[in-house]
Design a protein with these regions (language model features):
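Conserved phosphate-binding catalytic cores of ATP/NTP-utilizing and phosphoryl-transfer enzymes
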Residues: 1, 109-131, 310
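Short beta-strand scaffold segments in enzyme catalytic cores
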Residues: 13-18, 132, 140-144
């Protein structure tokens, strides 16, 4: 069996072909960073137009590298959401057309579930139960995984996601886009204790996240210290802000560990490429005597290999895909907390 996965939830146009043995025959990702850089963030209309321009090439190149034809595919998979609705519809419409023409199943995939599945691409035997921290530009969520394909939402962001907070501070300082990698590079030689940021935490015992207060505190520091690209303590400021974001992420994860008693921890999503976060995450896992799993950087950011992999797992376990033309995209988070 071979499955073609398509991912267009935000600003990467991606396609991948996986076998039922989870061997990646090809994976192509076309970034739009240069398109959105002048605006300091993703412009939804430009993103969807760029997907329209690129998707035919990306899928064709993916099939060429995999040395497979449409007739050689057994199923298709596509991200349904959450994400930018215009971008999602480009990928979904393209996948529907292929699946309907070839009379093959089309598996609809949730973007956050696909990010969790990315950990299994290289670590197929992760012990359960597990707690997964999904951190990306648009989402920050905690999940409890009782087993494969069985996840429960523990907490999510109430406002800005971690990646959004990093991007917005970078944009305010004129550091470039995408902001997260720029901040990481400039913060590498800084003192993370130079500027004090309070740990944001929701009321009661909630495991939800909120980064708007942290962002506001950073903007206040920028105003009070006249922080700029040329400020002598810019590296210290960025290191302190990055450290505060990481502490906030792992504080909730640590409380989830105490409450739900997992045997494994998973870190995934685009922000999981951050070296400081990866280091602190592994330190937490070691101190808690838990196994830790993080995808390789290439599988942290949006890609179609994780989409195809989740489809393979669903088909392997007997999950029946819906009717091709009935599938629809959804921009908002809809995973149940039950």
């Amino acid at each position: 069996m071979a499955v073609l996965g398509i991912e267009t939830s935000c600003d990467e146009t991606a396609a991948a072909v996986l076998t039922v043995e989870r061997k990646i025959l090809s994976s192509v990702v076309l970034s739009q960073d240069e398109v959105h850089a002048p605006y300091g963030g993703v412009v939804p209309e430009l993103a969807s137009r760029q997907h329209l321009h690129s998707i035919g090439y990306v899928v064709g190149e993916c099939l060429r590298r995999a040395a497979i034809s449409l007739d050689g595919l057994d199923a298709y998979a596509v991200t349904l959401g959450p994400g930018l609705i215009g971008s999602l519809l480009v990928g979904l419409s393209f996948a529907k057309g292929l699946a309907y023409y070839c009379q093959k199943p089309l598996v609809g995939i949730d973007h956050l579930e696909a990010h969790m599945e990315s950990a299994f691409l290289e670590h197929p035997d992760i012990p359960f139960p597990a707690v997964a921290l999904v951190v990306s530009g648009g989402h920050t969520s905690l999940f409890f995984l009782k087993k494969r394909l069985d996840s429960k939402l523990l907490g999510r962001t109430r406002d800005d996601a971690a990646g959004e907070a990093l991007d917005k501070i970078a944009k305010f300082l004129g550091l470039g886009y995408p902001g997260g990698p720029v901040i990481e590079k400039m913060a590498s030689a800084g003192d993370p204790e130079k500027f004090a940021f309070s740990l944001p935490r929701m009321k009661n015992s909630s495991l939800d996240y909120s980064f708007s207060g942290l962002k506001t505190a950073a903007l206040k520091w920028i105003d009070e210290t006249k922080m700029s690209k040329n400020h002598p303590h810019l590296g210290d400021f960025l290191a302190s802000f990055e450290e505060a974001v990481v502490r906030a992420l792992l504080d909730n994860l640590s409380r989830a560990v105490q409450e739900f008693k997992p045997v494994s921890l998973i870190l995934c999503g685009g922000v999981a490429r951050n070296k400081r976060l990866r280091l602190r995450f592994e330190e937490l896992a070691r101190s808690s005597r838990l196994s830790s799993f993080i995808p390789s950087p290439q599988f942290c950011t949006d890609n179609a290999a994780m989409v195809a992999a989740l489809a393979v797992e669903k088909l392997r376990t007997g999950k029946k895909p819906g009717r091709v033309l009935d599938l629809d995209a959804y921009p908002r988070f809809i995973i149940s907390t039950e």
